[in-house]
Structures are given as structure tokens and as C-alpha cells.
Amino acid sequence: MHIVEGHIEAKSAKVAIVVSRFNSFVVESLLSGAIDTLKRFGQVSEDNITVVRVPGAFELPLAAKKVAASGKFDGIIALGAVIRGGTPHFDFVAGECNKGLAQVSLEFNTPVSFGVLTTDTIEQAIERSGTKAGNKGGEAALGLLEMVNVLNAIDKEL
């Protein structure tokens, strides 16, 4: 049996982090967690990390698509926070963001890690951005590092 796996270390990986400015009090913590994880666990050089800021989560897929189309990056991390309010706006933004980012990944054969919080409350968002429930930005970075490596391994081994 042949097993193909990805590892976390990716010293030469070029990573773009596409970040929503909306709900920045949460998203900046996600960004810090992602960058810290890329550097500490992936040993990615700061020179190989590019941050692209967009207004909100709805704009993340288009920016990620443009980044992927450039061919300059091994992977993309999308970070944002969509917090439920009193209208259906949450459902539209969260759903389209998710679908759009998945489409970018499949269209360009580039891993796009989903670090967009979709929570019912501000408290839940804060918990997931570095307090009680860990830092989902860091988790998204770990997932991206593994996917970059597993895709490279598939190319080499299969």
C-alpha cells in the first residue's frame, strides 16, 4: 500500500493571506495566529508571506481568485469573521464566501484554507480568535501547510 501525506514544514512555500477588514477586532487576531503558525511550524520566511486586505468576507473570493491567477503563490489563507445579526445577510455572505473560496481552489489547483469565522455571537468569534477555542487563523495556516505539501507529494509520487 502506498500512502501519500503532507507534512507541516514548508520553508520555501509562498503564501498569500487574504484578510477581511470587517470585524477587524477579531480578524487581526486570526491574522496574527496565521502568521505565527506559518513562521513557527512551517518555517516559512516572512519574505514569502503576502497579506492582501479586502473590505469584507464577501470580497475574499475575488481577491483570492486574482491571487491564485497570478501563479506566484503555493497557497492562500482566507481570513474573516461573519457574525450573525438580525437579518438573513449573514447566510448570504457566509455561504457565498465559502462557495467562492472553494471554487477558487478547484479552478486553480491551489489550496485555499478557509479561516473565516461564521458565528452566532461576538463572544463566539472572540473565543475562536485566540482565547478559549484556540485560534482558527493558526489552524487555517496548519491546514494550508499540509495541503501545499500533500499536493506536491501527489505530483512527485503518483
Curated annotation (Swiss-Prot):
GO terms for cellular component: cytosol; riboflavin synthase complex. Keywords: Riboflavin biosynthesis, Transferase. Pfam families: DMRL_synthase. One of its GO terms (biological process) is riboflavin biosynthetic process. 5-amino-6-(D-ribitylamino)uracil binds at F22, A57, F58, E59, A81, V82, I83, F114. Pathway: Cofactor biosynthesis; riboflavin biosynthesis; riboflavin from 2-hydroxy-3-oxobutyl phosphate and 5-amino-6-(D-ribitylamino)uracil: step 1/2. SUPFAM superfamilies: Lumazine synthase. (2S)-2-hydroxy-3-oxobutyl phosphate binds at G86, T87, R128. The active site is at H89 (proton donor). It comes from the Bacteria. Its EC number is 2.5.1.78. Transmembrane segments: none annotated. It catalyses: (2S)-2-hydroxy-3-oxobutyl phosphate + 5-amino-6-(D-ribitylamino)uracil = 6,7-dimethyl-8-(1-D-ribityl)lumazine + phosphate + 2 H2O + H(+). It is an enzyme of class 2 (transferase). GO terms for molecular function: 6,7-dimethyl-8-ribityllumazine synthase activity. Belongs to the DMRL synthase family. NCBIfam families: lumazine-synth, PRK00061.1-4. Catalyzes the formation of 6,7-dimethyl-8-ribityllumazine by condensation of 5-amino-6-(D-ribitylamino)uracil with 3,4-dihydroxy-2-butanone 4-phosphate. This is the penultimate step in the biosynthesis of riboflavin. PANTHER family: 6,7-DIMETHYL-8-RIBITYLLUMAZINE SYNTHASE, 6,7-DIMETHYL-8-RIBITYLLUMAZINE SYNTHASE DMRL SYNTHASE LUMAZINE SYNTHASE. Forms an icosahedral capsid composed of 60 subunits, arranged as a dodecamer of pentamers. This is 6,7-dimethyl-8-ribityllumazine synthase. It comes from Shewanella amazonensis (strain ATCC BAA-1098 / SB2B). The lineage of its organism: Bacteria, Pseudomonadati, Pseudomonadota, Gammaproteobacteria, Alteromonadales. The gene is ribH.
